[in-house]
Amino acid sequence: MAKISPTQRSLEYLREQGYHVEIVEKWNHWARIRQDLWGWCDLLALRKNEVLAVQVTASAVATRIKKIQDSPTVQFVRDAGIRIEVHGWRQNSKGEWVIRVEDIS
């Protein structure tokens, strides 16, 4: 069975919450790296009167929060009224995937 990425898990989670979601990271062929929107955003989610930017990780939520807070773009995003969340995914003792959502708007 194919392994489901944290990004795919967050896509499903957000769609269940009623968001229209798109992946906004891209593959830079020349540098051979993934580049996130604004340097930290993996997903952009829309719902009536709401825009949500999401950074997704398998772990290291605190590291991702610091990365966003240190970003020169984060204040522009906040000033635009865009909410910001970090989604951390892990397996619990039963082997079930659970999400940790940190709102850092």
Language model segments and positions:
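Catalytic phosphate/metal-binding cores of nucleic-acid and nucleotide-processing enzymes, i.e., regions
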Residues: 1-105
